[in-house]
Amino acid sequence: MAGTVKFIFQPAEEGAQTGENGGASMMVEEGVLDNPKVDAIYGLHINSATPVGTVRYKSKGIMAAAQRFVIDVKGKQAHGSTPWVSVDPIVISAQIINGIQTIISRNSELTKEGAVITIGSIHSGIRFNIIPESAQLIGTIRTLDDDMKQLIIRRMNELAPQIAAAYGGSATVDIKETAALTYNDPTLTLKAVNSLKKTLGQKNVMEMRAVTGAEDFSAFQERVPGFYFFLGGLIQGNSPHEAPSHHTPEFEVDDAGLIHGVKAMVGLTLDYLK
């Protein structure tokens, strides 16, 4: 074998805690791709809806870029019995939620690439009969195109404060990058696909569409050519369309798929170093 193989065991694969550094970006900063210098990198992820013995891949963008956003809404507190003396941050938040969804439906060129804005957390108030002073919305942006990402960021920074102002309140928007676009180098992908077909069989190597999940493996790919793909772990007898999703209590995969993942990664390594 004409070369060196480096195994990377990454902590905080799902990202570090808010306000902390971690995951792939921290490893890159600490020199994981140096000494010896890495020329190419491969990543593999199990998938509960892909049949055992198969793998799926896509050249270029395969997983979305992701940002975490926080919108802080400021109003004026009052008793629930006298809403006319308040500036209700909950009402403002509802209008902001509706407003930013129009960024996807009315501003984004969805025939080009998909995009997602999801608000997963809303916090406001502590009593049923008090209109609170503030509210906070926390969510994620997913994009497969940098121009669309910039459009969404710009429109969110425009819409939220202007909507809040229209109701007599104010709003600030803070957006932080959590993962760049997971981008499979086309030249490395072509070489990898030929290797996978040799190892697993041509019919077991399938092309896929991009997904709006995100992966901080992209931090490695920003420095060196990379190839990221998915390994089959579908439970026998389950329908791919009904397989429990990742990050749910029902998630389950067939361990029989792991041997195919080992074979795939070994084959990729040996073929690259020939």
Regions found by a protein language model. Give the residues of each.
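Histidine/acidic-residue-rich, glycine-tolerant segments that coordinate divalent metal ions
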Residues: M1-S121, I126-I130, P240
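Metal-dependent amide/peptide-bond hydrolase catalytic core
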Residues: A94-K274
